[in-house]
From Swiss-Prot:
Description of what induces expression: Upon glucose starvation, as well as treatment with tunicamycin.
Catalytic activity, reaction form: Catalyzes the rearrangement of -S-S- bonds in proteins
Source lineage: Eukaryota, Metazoa, Chordata, Craniata, Vertebrata
NCBIfam families the record matches: ER_PDI_fam, pdi_dom
Family that this chain belongs to: Belongs to the protein disulfide isomerase family.
Subcellular location: Endoplasmic reticulum lumen; Melanosome
UniProt-recorded name of the protein: Protein disulfide-isomerase A4
Post-translational modification as stated in the protein's UniProt record: O-glycosylated.
Alphabetized UniProt keyword annotations: Acetylation, Calcium, Disulfide bond, Endoplasmic reticulum, Glycoprotein, Isomerase, Redox-active center, Repeat, Signal
Known partners and oligomeric status: Part of a large chaperone multiprotein complex comprising DNAJB11, HSP90B1, HSPA5, HYOU, PDIA2, PDIA4, PDIA6, PPIB, SDF2L1, UGGT1 and very small amounts of ERP29, but not, or at very low levels, CALR nor CANX. Component of a complex containing at least CRELD2, MANF, MATN3 and PDIA4.
Cellular component annotations (GO), alphabetically ordered: cell surface; endoplasmic reticulum; endoplasmic reticulum chaperone complex; endoplasmic reticulum lumen; extracellular space; melanosome; smooth endoplasmic reticulum
Gene Ontology biological process terms from the UniProt entry: blood coagulation, fibrin clot formation; chaperone-mediated protein folding; platelet aggregation; positive regulation of protein folding; protein folding; response to endoplasmic reticulum stress
Acidic residues: bias regions: 32-56
Disulfide-linked positions: C89-C92, C204-C207, C553-C556
Length: 643
């Protein structure tokens, strides 16, 4: 009996273990089975995320596109109106209500036409693809091909243009810009009174940016009477033409007059090109018919009188004079005469170039006129050099209107006071100018000028002279961009003479506009101020990437996080500095670092600070800025992998 109970107990234990094992296996199978739903949930979430990226939202009737959903959205649409905008752009905000009205109108079109907007600051791929360089930029997409819209930003005009493009039989108008090759170049250029030619490379970013503006200008100028043609040359294919005209960069633009080339120095957008070429199409020199005109120039003029005296339009010297005038027409007013009466008054024979200063700028220390013999064999470049050399009086009047064209040469000695050549104040103005003349005659290597203290109030303030208490102040601006102020004292010729001599001997300390030097400057991006520019940027032992910015600049604000990331990326390199400078609050103490817009970025290589490399053409993102640094960094700052 006991034995039977024992066996029953053993059997019961065995069954219990079997049941436990089976239960564990079922649990394991359940767990295994349950893994698939979890994975499926993950896949579903990923699919949902992908769908979210591709989802197109609508805001007030306008579709919102980005880099991810753009292609899917436009794939099945014949016509789409696109606006590229920036969230901070004032013009974009102003245009938004009008754009929503356009969307509403085109939605009711038969068939409906989609209207979309793209934040170009975040959709960088699309902005690059469509060459967006300003905001807002409007384009019409026709069967996947972008059509530039350059009309007014009004509902009426935009809707009309979109409906025109949406027609089934619409095709893009033929290109107005002429395409030149070695086969047709000379024939076209030699027969044109004036023509603008662009030498470009298909891969060049600046050329791509210029292309739509250039074509718009070509269309506008083709409507003139007579029309002014614009042409282009692919310099990578037409290498002989590129070599013939010394094309070394892209795009290179040249003006041709009956085959003679002249540099194009104008703007690179539609209206700038149009205005510049219209001005260039006129005669470079104006004919003077009477002696009275010459006398009025001398009595009441405000600038150098440039007068060519010739026998007639067939005079070979006259043709050379015209060529020279064309090269300088933006900076000077040229005149010519065929009058023997005027020649007699000037006491010169025919075939002469005469330069004279108005009476108010004449002095006993300089000749009344400069005369050059001009014949058919005289080079236009020689005439040009002569004009530039003798265009300024010994002490001229520096004004905001002539500063860039007349007084860019350094060193420049400037005397500031109340300059007024009107009848009532001319005597006082000339009194101080005569004091300056007495010094200027002894320093022919320097340029001297007087300037009205009100016109240059900001400059006077930056020099620390606005509170000097003196009626007359003086300063010297040197070749490197440094400024030197004369200590406030009673002004006379002796004081000015002493000041200029001290500058010549290198005994003066420059005045530098500068924010306070940062106490803690160990961040990834070094802060440069006027007083530290030389110490940081011009350090000969270090490569420096310097960004010049303005606090109010939208593009600068957009760049800031990217630039900080760049600083962090290269922070470990001891011989490379990533830096920035508020160019509105600090002096740039070296004129090789020219800033004409914001942001401006330069790479200052170690050992060659006088030849900084400007960042141009690429996107201002981490990838392109890093590539720029790596391309130009010296061995000192290259990474170990590169070495």
């Amino acid at each position: 009996m006991k034995l039977r109970k024992a066996w029953l107990l053993v059997l019961l234990l065995a069954l219990t273990q079997l049941l436990a094992a089976a239960s564990a296996e079922d649990a394991h199978e359940d767990a295994s089975d349950s893994e698939n739903p979890i994975e499926d949930d993950d896949d579903e979430e990923e699919d949902e995320e992908d769908e979210d990226d591709l989802e197109v939202k609508e805001e007030n009737g306008v579709w919102v596109l980005n880099d991810e959903n753009f292609d899917n959205f436009v794939a099945d649409k014949d016509t789409v109106l696109l606006e590229f905008y920036a969230p901070w752009c004032g013009h974009c905000k102003q245009f938004a209500p009008e754009y929503e009205k356009i969307a509403s109108t085109l939605k009711d079109n038969d068939p409906p036409i989609a209207v979309a907007k793209i934040d170009a600051t975040s959709a960088s791929m699309l902005a690059s693809k469509f060459d967006v360089s300003g905001y807002p930029t409007i384009k019409i997409l026709k069967k996947g091909q972008a059509v530039d819209y350059d009309g007014s930003r009004t509902q009426e005009e935009i809707v009309a243009k979109v409906r025109e493009v949406s027609q089934p039989d619409w095709t893009p108008p033929p290109e107005v810009t002429l395409t030149l090759t070695k086969e047709n170049f000379d024939d076209v250029v030699n027969n044109a009174d004036i023509i603008l030619v662009e030498f470009y490379a298909p891969w060049c970013g600046h050329c791509k940016k210029l292309a739509p503006e250039y074509e718009k200008a070509a269309k506008e100028l083709s409507k003139r009477s007579p029309p002014i043609p614009l042409a282009k040359v692919d310099a990578t294919e037409q290498t002989d033409l590129a070599k013939r005209f010394d094309v070394s960069g892209y795009p290179t633009l040249k003006i041709f007059r009956k085959g003679r080339p002249f540099d194009y120095n104008g703007p690179r957008e539609k209206y700038g090109i149009v205005d510049y070429m219209v001005e260039q199409s006129g005669p470079p020199s104006k004919e003077i018919l009477t002696l009275k005109q010459v006398q009025e120039f001398l009595k009441d003029g405000d600038d150098v009188v440039i007068l060519g005296v010739f026998q007639g339009v067939g005079d070979p010297g006259y043709l050379q004079y015209q060529d020279a005038a064309n090269t300088l027409r933006e900076d000077y007013k040229f005149h010519h005469t065929f009058s023997t009466e005027i020649a007699k008054f000037l006491k010169v024979s025919l075939g002469k170039l005469v330069l004279m200063q108005p009476e108010k700028f004449q002095s006993k220390y300089e000749p009344r006129m400069h005369v050059m013999d001009v014949q058919g064999s005289t080079e236009a470049s020689a005439i040009k050099d002569y004009v530039v050399k003798h265009a300024l009086p010994l002490v001229g009047h520096r004004k905001t209107s002539n500063d860039a064209k007349r007084y860019s040469k350094r060193p420049l000695v400037v005397v500031y006071y109340s300059v007024d050549f009107s009848f009532d104040y001319r005597t006082a103005t000339q009194f101080w100018r005569n004091k300056v003349l007495e010094v200027a005659k002894d320093f022919p290597e320097y340029t001297f000028a007087i300037a009205d203290e009100e016109d240059y109030a900001t400059e006077v303030k930056d020099l620390g002279l606005s509170e000097s208490g003196e009626d007359v102040n003086a300063a010297i601006l040197d070749e490197s961009g440094k400024k030197f102020a004369m200590e406030p004292e009673e002004f006379d010729s002796d004081a000015l003479q002493e000041f200029v001599m001290a500058f010549k001997k290198g005994k003066l300390k420059p005045v530098i506009k500068s924010q306070p030097v940062p106490k803690n400057n160990k961040g990834p991006v070094r802060v440069v101020v006027g007083k530290t520019f030389d110490a940081i940027v011009m350090d000969p032992k270090k490569d420096v990437l310097i960004e010049f910015y303005a606090p109010w600049c939208g593009h600068c604000k957009q760049l800031e996080p990217v630039y900080t990331s760049l600083g962090k990326k290269y922070k470990g390199q001891k011989d490379l500095v990533i830096a920035k400078m508020d160019a509105t609050a600090n002096d740039i103490t070296n004129d090789r670092y020219k800033v004409e817009g914001f942001p401006t970025i330069y790479f200052a290589p170690s050992g060659d600070k006088k030849n900084p490399i400007k960042f141009e053409g690429g996107n201002r993102d981490l990838e392109h800025l890093s590539k720029f640094i790596d391309e130009h960094a010296t061995k000192r700052s290259r990474t170990k992998e590169e070495l």
